[in-house]
């Protein structure tokens, strides 16, 4: 009986953590990087936002066998003057979350959040980072993900659009199906 109470408490705590609201990633809590590349062979680019290394994690061989979950570092670059909200959708949110990106510390699922709103520094603010001489705002962060790999549907809302652009990424899951309607 005691084991059931402990397991129930852990589930409630994780469920509470997964539903937690998150602080936005803003100019005030950005990181700084030297000259960067926005679009590489491993970049996921949606409008003014780039995850410049996320596609490198697609092969199942990207797993490093840590359990019960692992941390996949993938920063974000956002062109000046833009806002993009990214949401992990569907069942993937139970096993995957955003960590870092100007929020609280930690790299576990319990530390993660399911939605991040990225607001770049304004066109006349110094972000300290650039791509091709053009200002971008940079945030360090990534994903907490299960050790078995997962296909993660992401909805991108660019510049306060109410219409999502859905992309499915592979975090060590190999090839993922094409996204359904967003």
Give residue spans per PLM region.
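Non-catalytic macromolecular-recognition regions in eukaryotic signaling proteins
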Residues: 15-182
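Secretory targeting and sorting signals
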Residues: 1-19
């Amino acid at each position: 009986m005691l084991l059931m109470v402990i397991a129930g408490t852990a589930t409630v705590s994780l469920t509470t953590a997964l539903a937690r609201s998150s602080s936005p990633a803003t100019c005030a809590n950005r990181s700084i990087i030297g000259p960067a590349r926005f679009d590489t062979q491993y970049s996921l680019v949606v409008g003014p936002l780039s995850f410049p290394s996320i596609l490198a994690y697609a092969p199942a061989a990207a797993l490093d066998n840590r359990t019960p979950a692992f941390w996949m570092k993938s920063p974000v670059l956002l062109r000046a003057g833009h806002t993009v909200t990214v949401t992990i959708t569907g069942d993937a949110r139970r096993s995957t979350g955003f960590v870092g990106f100007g929020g609280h510390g930690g790299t576990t699922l319990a530390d993660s959040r399911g939605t991040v709103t990225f607001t770049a520094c304004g066109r006349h603010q110094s972000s300290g980072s650039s791509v091709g001489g053009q200002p971008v705002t940079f945030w360090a962060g990534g994903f907490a993900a299960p050790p078995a790999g997962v296909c993660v549907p992401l909805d991108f809302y660019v510049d306060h659009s109410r219409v999502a652009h859905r992309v499915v990424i592979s975090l060590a899951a190999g090839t993922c199906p094409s996204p359904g309607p967003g």
